[in-house]
């Protein structure tokens, strides 16, 4: 790990609040009445109810959505036996992933106990607190005994993710890979490099799914695990000892269909790959350097399918595809265990997601990636929104069918709808955008290159690799401010600076601006003056002339001033009536989009309809299916005046032209975001679930609502997103944060990619 990364990580963890987790109160605590319910005397009622019926704990407490991530720190990532306390940052990180991907609450518990039996006694005493236990970073072979003992003693799920999470995702890759090459598990021969906890769990799961044990040959750092071997053997490894003359990996790989590597870098040689069967499946999962690099495999076996543990190659085997969702399904049915049936359901659900045709939502979220089932797409993307709905539901159903569910689900359609809401509760909504931006970064010019926020954002953009920043400003000022801010980026190395006063393209841009504005009272001399002095103008001309791919401006100066320049130089896309804006708000309880917050003071019905349609396309870029509500002081006809009639007309227009859209109005704000309230007032509303795209009747309503929600709700904003422009350009605001600039950079890069692909 580089010193620079070390320092950044230490600052990240030390920033207030310390660490990565916090506990929040979920019930009102504002009045004496609230306190009397939360604690004494009112709390006695749920206590007595649970005493009478233990299953009520999931109804009256957080236990049903609470798991423990537990370790003794004996096998921490690549750090080894660093101890319980030193492992805490890793356990907090694991807890954060559970919360981020599946909205599961977690306590991380680090136990300084290396005796397996005493460790089990301590953990068993925690059963009353948790709905499930995720064992983490416990060394083999003790981890096998610990998990088996706890599974026998406890009536809640116990899951060692290092074993079974890896096994599930590996098995899904194998199932998908064999489908692609037309082979079956029953007829395949598999060799492994590595015989630790994860490798043995992979083998156990594949055997339970139909891989004959006689078709498996295992090797470790000593060599082949053969019948009669005594060196570094244990009862778990001995189950896969074979009567064979092979003693090395090279000996045993002849004719193998599958290579499973969970061992060390570079143990598989290219010449070994040439000995494998036709169309071999190679899972080289050592991290960060695999057993063999994919390009080395392809050089000698172009017919091979390769999986790694790395995100920079196709087919990443990543446990995050599994552990949040298998626990989500297990908790939701009150499972007493995570059994083989549930694990196999998870395997097949993952493979089915990859094999199925992605929805429009997924295609937009991962646009221009190869999402067609095949050699380079065996597993879903980690941020595929279908993971939580498909995997969790499959696991829940398997728990019910195998008899370990204590709270069976009656309506799976309603359950899937509830699961889909978890996707939109955090900044995870931005991750598909960032992932795509990183794959094909574009040149983004920033009009306010000297602004501190722009400079700090540029550093993050360089670090994340989502764009090539080009800053408009004076090089000396930018370099000095970057130094003052302790930024590591350097002009000419990882950022570019363009000073309009001295830029070689000044004359050409001035002439171009004159051509655009000659009929608007701008002389050649005035054109040069404007281009030289207005950084927004210069940046917009760079975009128009194709010298950059996208543009952001607006952090300094009035929005309208920037808008005027954008209208002059970039203009509207073909067929668009007028520009408008959309703002996204990522709040703790959901993600919402509001329009038009910045441009059209009092839009007509036609303008409302247009901005709604343009907004729908943008919302889908985030992997979110838009549910549109047009808001008003009138609630489904309670008022009949010009304002309500305008909104009503826009709804009719949209329904006529886009009958497939989930859209309704005119309605109150509370009816839009609460299906319960909406049904009370108007049971026949076409809108299902809660609206996430709120079209306001005028700019006053939109801007006030957005700014209040942002401040009071503590949300992260994305935008303003400029709708209807002829190029990827967006105007930020003077209140934009560094994070907001970074978010909009990623979004603008994706827009540039899409426009380029369409041209």
Name what the model sees in each region.
Residues 2-158, 397-398, 405, 431-455, ...:
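N-terminal ligand-binding/catalytic initiation module
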Residues 66-78, 83, 167-171, 181-207:
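Glycine-rich adenosine-cofactor-binding loop
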Residues 85, 137-184, 406-409, 416-759:
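Anion-binding alpha/beta catalytic cores of soluble intermediary-metabolism enzymes, centered on
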Residues 127, 185, 252-253, 273-276, ...:
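A short, aliphatic-rich alpha-helical micro-motif
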Residues 157, 161-162, 181-187, 284-392, ...:
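Adenosine-phosphate binding glycine-rich loop
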Residues 193, 209-236:
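NAD(P)-binding Rossmann-fold cofactor-contacting core
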Residues 237-305, 310-312:
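Rossmann-like adenosine-cofactor binding region
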């Amino acid at each position: 790990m580089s010193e620079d990364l070390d320092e950044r990580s230490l600052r990240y963890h030390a920033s207030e609040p310390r660490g990565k987790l916090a506990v929040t109160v979920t019930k009102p605590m504002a009045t004496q009445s609230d306190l009397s319910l939360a604690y004494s005397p009112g709390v006695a009622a749920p206590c007595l109810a649970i005493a009478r019926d233990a299953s009520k704990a999931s109804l009256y407490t957080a236990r049903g959505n609470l798991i423990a991530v537990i370790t003794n720190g004996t096998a921490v990532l690549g750090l080894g036996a660093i101890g319980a306390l030193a492992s805490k940052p890793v356990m907090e990180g694991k807890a954060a992933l559970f919360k981020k991907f599946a909205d599961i609450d977690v306590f991380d518990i680090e136990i300084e106990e290396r005796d397996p039996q005493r460790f089990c006694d301590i953990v068993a005493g925690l059963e009353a607190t948790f709905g499930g236990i995720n064992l983490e970073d416990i060394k083999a072979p003790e981890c096998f005994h610990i998990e088996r003992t706890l599974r026998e003693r406890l009536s809640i799920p116990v899951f060692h993710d290092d074993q079974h999470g890896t096994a599930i995702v590996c098995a899904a890759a194998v199932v998908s890979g064999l489908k692609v090459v037309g082979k079956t598990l029953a007829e395949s021969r598999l060799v492994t490099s590595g015989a630790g906890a994860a490798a043995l769990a992979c083998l156990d799961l594949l055997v339970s799914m139909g891989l004959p044990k006689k078709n498996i040959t295992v090797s470790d750092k000593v060599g082949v695990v053969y019948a009669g071997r005594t060196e570094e053997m244990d009862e778990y490894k001995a189950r896969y000892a074979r009567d064979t003359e092979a003693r090395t990996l090279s000996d045993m790989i002849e004719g193998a269909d599958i290579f499973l590597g969970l061992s060390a870098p570079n143990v598989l040689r290219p010449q070994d790959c040439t000995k494998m069967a036709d169309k071999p499946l190679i899972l080289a999962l050592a991290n960060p350097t695999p057993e063999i690099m994919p390009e080395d495999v392809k050089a000698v076996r172009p017919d091979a399918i390769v999986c790694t543990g790395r995100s920079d190659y196709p087919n990443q085997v990543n446990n995050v595809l599994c552990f949040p969702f298998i626990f989500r399904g297990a908790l939701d049915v009150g499972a007493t265990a995570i059994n083989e049936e549930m694990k196999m359901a998870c395997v097949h659900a993952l493979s089915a997601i990859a094999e199925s045709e992605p929805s429009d939502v997924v295609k937009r979220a991962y646009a221009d990636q190869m999402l067609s089932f095949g050699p380079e797409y065996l597993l879903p993307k980690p941020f595929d929104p279908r993971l939580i709905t498909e995997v969790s539901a499959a696991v829940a159903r398997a728990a019910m069918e195998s008899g370990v569910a204590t709270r069976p689900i009656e309506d799976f359609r309603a359950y899937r709808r509830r699961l889909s809401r978890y996707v939109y509760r955090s900044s995870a909504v931005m991750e598909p955008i960032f992932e795509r931006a990183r794959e094909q970064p574009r040149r983004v010019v920033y009009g306010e290159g000297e602004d501190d926020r722009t400079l700090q954002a540029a550093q993050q953009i360089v670090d994340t690799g989502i764009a090539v920043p080009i800053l408009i400003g004076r090089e000396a000022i930018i370099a000095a401010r970057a130094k003052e801010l302790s930024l590591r980026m350097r002009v000419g190395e990882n950022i570019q600076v363009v000073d309009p006063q001295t830029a070689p393209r000044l004359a050409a841009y001035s002439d171009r601006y004159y051509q655009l504005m000659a009929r608007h009272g701008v002389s050649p001399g005035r054109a040069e003056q404007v281009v030289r002095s207005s950084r927004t103008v210069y940046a917009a001309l760079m975009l128009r002339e194709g010298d950059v791919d996208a543009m952001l401006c607006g952090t300094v100066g009035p929005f309208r001033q920037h808008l005027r320049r954008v209208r002059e130089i970039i203009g509207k896309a073909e067929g668009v009536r007028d520009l408008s804006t959309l703002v996204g708000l990522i709040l703790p309880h959901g993600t919402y989009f509001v329009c038009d917050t910045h441009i059209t003071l009092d839009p007509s019905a036609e303008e409302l309809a247009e901005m709604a349609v343009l907004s729908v396309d943008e919302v889908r870029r985030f992997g979110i299916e838009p549910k549109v509500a047009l808001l008003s002081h009138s609630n489904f006809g309670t008022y009949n005046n010009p304002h309500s009639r305008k909104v009503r007309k826009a709804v009719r227009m949209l329904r006529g032209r886009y009958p497939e859209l989930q859209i309704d109005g005119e309605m109150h704000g509370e009816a839009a975001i609460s299906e319960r309230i909406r049904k009370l007032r108007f049971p026949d509303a076409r809108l299902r679930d809660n609206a996430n795209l709120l079209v306001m009747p005028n700019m006053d309503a939109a801007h006030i609502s957005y700014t209040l929600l942002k401040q009071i709700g503590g949300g992260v904003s994305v935008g303003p997103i400029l709708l209807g422009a002829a190029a990827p350009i967006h105007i930020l605001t003077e209140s934009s944060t560094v994070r907001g600039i970074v978010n909009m950079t990623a979004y603008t890069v994706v827009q540039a990619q899409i426009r380029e692909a369409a041209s």
